[in-house]
Amino acid sequence: MHSIVCFTSDFGTNDGWVGICHAVIYRSCPGVRVVDLAHDIPPFDIRKAAAVAAAGVWQLPDAIHLVVADPGVGGGRRDLVLVTSGGSILVGPDNGVLLPATWRGGGISRAYAIDATRIGFHAPLATFHARDVLAPAVALLASGVDVVAFGDPVDPSTLVEAPFLPGHREVDSMAAEVIDIDRFGSIRIAVSADDVAANGLDRGRLEVVFGHARIELPFGRTYSDVDEGDPVALIDSSGWLTVAVHLGSACERYAVEPGALVRVRALA
């Protein structure tokens, strides 16, 4: 059994949707603890939801992760249960929102498309799959039901692509995307802590190029490794390479938005 469910969505907290999903889970599995990771994700923002879910798996790998940012709900896309090599379980729509979290969990080991009839739902599905399919599936998983009971296996190569791709090596640099901007204006880049170490980016100074902006800055352990107003590169609490400004906004200073292409290289 899994004792913790991490719940990420773009539902907000004013309309009762989060509470309804909680109630569905508790009704079938009263012993589970549901942790609300984030529900103030901008509506339909699959990229942001994917980033938050990936951080959740990195910090709580042994939990079940329910992730819902689903602009295509009711439109025929699949509902999924994914199991990572590290043992994390992810439940959500097949729109790419789950994939970055699987990278943080060591990759996909098993994937299943949820058959709503196998979890007891027989009415026509419409606009609230989180209540009608995903939350009931999470409750069954938390109760110890094996993932094979939910539907047919899925070839991971057929899943909808992630909203951003992991960084990759290009000659003497790492090329990646800006994942998102945190509320302090720090710029998260799709380069994991492991990739930073493997590519020698955790020593000395770095060059970071955001297309229009070229920055030289130190790689540090924390924001206060530099003076107030100075930039620093570090691994943030979500486990991503991040460009920050001590007591300032890197996003405002460098005019960078999510999705921007980045190149990072170590300076001699």
Say what each PLM segment does.
Residues 3-6, 32-35, 63-66, 79-81, ...:
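Structural motif
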Residues 9-11, 37-39, 68-71, 84-85, ...:
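Fold-independent oxyanion-binding glycine-rich loops
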Residues 121-202:
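Anionic-ligand-binding alpha/beta catalytic cores of soluble enzymes and soluble regulatory domains
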Residues 190-255:
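A conserved acidic, glycine/proline-rich C-terminal tail/linker
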Residues 28-33, 48, 59-69, 74-132:
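Active-site histidine-anchored catalytic micro-motif
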Residues 260-266:
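Surface-exposed interaction regions enriched in Ser/Thr/Asp/Glu
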Residues 1-76:
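N-terminal glycine-/serine-/threonine-rich phosphate-binding loop
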Residues 16, 20, 29, 44, ...:
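Conserved active-site and cofactor/substrate-binding residues in soluble primary-metabolism enzymes
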